[in-house]
Amino acid sequence: MKKIFIACPFIKFINGTRFINNGFKEFTEELYDLCKEYASDVFLALKREDYGNKPLTNYSCSMDLKEAKNSDIVIAIPDDSMGVAVELGWMSAMKKTIILILNKNQKYTPLIKNIHKITPGKVLFYENGEINCLKDIKETLEYYKNRME
Protein backbone atom coordinates (compact mmCIF):
# COMPACT_ATOMS: atom_id res chain seq x y z
CA MET A 1 0.00 0.00 0.00
CA LYS A 2 1.20 3.47 -0.84
CA LYS A 3 -0.95 5.82 1.20
CA ILE A 4 -3.03 5.68 4.37
CA PHE A 5 -5.56 8.39 5.26
CA ILE A 6 -6.30 8.82 8.97
CA ALA A 7 -9.71 10.40 9.59
CA CYS A 8 -10.42 11.54 13.13
CA PRO A 9 -12.09 14.30 15.15
CA PHE A 10 -10.21 17.57 14.97
CA ILE A 11 -12.09 20.75 15.85
CA LYS A 12 -13.48 19.53 19.17
CA PHE A 13 -9.93 19.06 20.48
CA ILE A 14 -8.69 22.54 19.50
CA ASN A 15 -8.98 25.57 21.77
CA GLY A 16 -7.49 28.53 19.91
CA THR A 17 -4.19 27.05 18.78
CA ARG A 18 -3.93 24.57 21.65
CA PHE A 19 -4.73 20.86 21.44
CA ILE A 20 -6.65 19.98 24.60
CA ASN A 21 -6.71 16.16 24.66
CA ASN A 22 -3.23 14.76 25.30
CA GLY A 23 -4.44 11.14 25.36
CA PHE A 24 -5.94 11.44 21.88
CA LYS A 25 -2.84 13.27 20.63
CA GLU A 26 -0.63 10.45 21.92
CA PHE A 27 -2.88 7.90 20.21
CA THR A 28 -2.85 9.71 16.85
CA GLU A 29 0.93 10.12 16.98
CA GLU A 30 1.42 6.41 17.69
CA LEU A 31 -1.13 5.53 15.00
CA TYR A 32 0.68 7.77 12.51
CA ASP A 33 4.02 6.12 13.31
CA LEU A 34 2.44 2.67 12.97
CA CYS A 35 0.97 3.59 9.58
CA LYS A 36 4.39 4.79 8.38
CA GLU A 37 5.56 1.19 8.79
CA TYR A 38 3.01 0.14 6.15
CA ALA A 39 2.82 3.09 3.74
CA SER A 40 5.34 5.62 2.52
CA ASP A 41 2.69 8.36 2.67
CA VAL A 42 0.30 8.91 5.58
CA PHE A 43 -2.22 11.76 5.74
CA LEU A 44 -3.35 13.07 9.12
CA ALA A 45 -4.90 16.56 9.12
CA LEU A 46 -3.89 17.02 12.77
CA LYS A 47 -0.25 16.55 11.77
CA ARG A 48 -0.59 18.86 8.74
CA GLU A 49 -1.80 21.62 11.06
CA ASP A 50 0.58 20.73 13.90
CA TYR A 51 -2.27 19.86 16.27
CA GLY A 52 -3.76 23.35 16.02
CA ASN A 53 -0.51 25.33 16.18
CA LYS A 54 -0.54 26.04 12.43
CA PRO A 55 -4.17 26.30 11.29
CA LEU A 56 -4.73 26.62 7.56
CA THR A 57 -5.72 30.14 6.60
CA ASN A 58 -7.53 29.07 3.42
CA TYR A 59 -8.99 25.64 4.15
CA SER A 60 -10.76 23.87 1.33
CA CYS A 61 -12.59 20.53 1.36
CA SER A 62 -10.97 19.81 -1.99
CA MET A 63 -7.59 19.53 -0.23
CA ASP A 64 -8.77 16.64 1.92
CA LEU A 65 -10.73 15.09 -0.95
CA LYS A 66 -7.54 15.01 -3.03
CA GLU A 67 -5.75 13.25 -0.17
CA ALA A 68 -8.64 10.78 0.07
CA LYS A 69 -8.62 10.00 -3.65
CA ASN A 70 -4.92 9.16 -3.51
CA SER A 71 -5.25 6.84 -0.50
CA ASP A 72 -5.41 3.06 -0.49
CA ILE A 73 -6.79 2.68 3.02
CA VAL A 74 -8.56 4.93 5.50
CA ILE A 75 -8.35 4.41 9.22
CA ALA A 76 -11.32 6.25 10.69
CA ILE A 77 -12.09 7.14 14.28
CA PRO A 78 -15.52 8.71 13.76
CA ASP A 79 -16.46 9.43 17.39
CA ASP A 80 -19.03 12.24 16.95
CA SER A 81 -17.25 14.05 14.11
CA MET A 82 -19.39 15.13 11.18
CA GLY A 83 -16.19 15.76 9.21
CA VAL A 84 -15.19 12.12 9.58
CA ALA A 85 -18.70 11.13 8.48
CA VAL A 86 -18.20 13.14 5.27
CA GLU A 87 -14.79 11.51 4.71
CA LEU A 88 -16.31 8.06 5.25
CA GLY A 89 -18.91 8.91 2.61
CA TRP A 90 -16.17 9.84 0.15
CA MET A 91 -14.17 6.73 0.91
CA SER A 92 -17.09 4.33 0.68
CA ALA A 93 -18.22 5.89 -2.63
CA MET A 94 -14.69 5.32 -3.95
CA LYS A 95 -14.73 1.72 -2.62
CA LYS A 96 -11.65 2.38 -0.49
CA THR A 97 -10.70 -0.06 2.25
CA ILE A 98 -11.95 1.34 5.56
CA ILE A 99 -10.70 0.34 9.00
CA LEU A 100 -13.17 1.72 11.53
CA ILE A 101 -12.09 2.28 15.13
CA LEU A 102 -15.17 2.34 17.36
CA ASN A 103 -15.67 2.72 21.10
CA LYS A 104 -17.36 -0.43 22.40
CA ASN A 105 -19.40 1.68 24.86
CA GLN A 106 -20.71 4.21 22.35
CA LYS A 107 -23.77 3.91 20.12
CA TYR A 108 -23.26 4.30 16.38
CA THR A 109 -25.66 4.51 13.48
CA PRO A 110 -25.95 1.28 11.47
CA LEU A 111 -24.62 3.28 8.49
CA ILE A 112 -21.27 3.48 10.29
CA LYS A 113 -21.17 0.04 11.90
CA ASN A 114 -22.10 -1.71 8.65
CA ILE A 115 -20.04 0.32 6.17
CA HIS A 116 -17.92 -2.76 5.47
CA LYS A 117 -20.97 -4.25 3.72
CA ILE A 118 -20.60 -1.77 0.85
CA THR A 119 -16.83 -1.32 0.74
CA PRO A 120 -13.87 -3.44 1.86
CA GLY A 121 -12.82 -3.04 5.45
CA LYS A 122 -13.03 -4.06 9.05
CA VAL A 123 -14.55 -2.71 12.26
CA LEU A 124 -12.36 -2.73 15.37
CA PHE A 125 -13.71 -1.97 18.83
CA TYR A 126 -11.77 -0.57 21.77
CA GLU A 127 -12.41 0.02 25.45
CA ASN A 128 -10.69 2.44 27.85
CA GLY A 129 -9.09 4.63 25.19
CA GLU A 130 -8.29 4.38 21.50
CA ILE A 131 -4.66 3.59 22.24
CA ASN A 132 -5.76 0.11 23.33
CA CYS A 133 -6.69 -0.65 19.72
CA LEU A 134 -3.19 -0.21 18.24
CA LYS A 135 -2.38 -3.94 18.33
CA ASP A 136 -5.58 -4.76 16.43
CA ILE A 137 -4.87 -1.98 13.93
CA LYS A 138 -1.38 -3.38 13.34
CA GLU A 139 -2.79 -6.87 12.71
CA THR A 140 -5.37 -5.45 10.31
CA LEU A 141 -2.78 -3.41 8.41
CA GLU A 142 -0.62 -6.51 8.14
CA TYR A 143 -3.58 -8.41 6.68
CA TYR A 144 -4.28 -5.72 4.06
CA LYS A 145 -0.59 -5.29 3.27
CA ASN A 146 -0.42 -8.97 2.32
CA ARG A 147 -3.61 -8.73 0.25
CA MET A 148 -2.47 -5.63 -1.65
CA GLU A 149 0.95 -6.96 -2.64
Tell me what each language-model feature is:
Residues 1-149:
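Conserved catalytic or regulatory cores that recognize and/or transform ribose-phosphate-containing ligands
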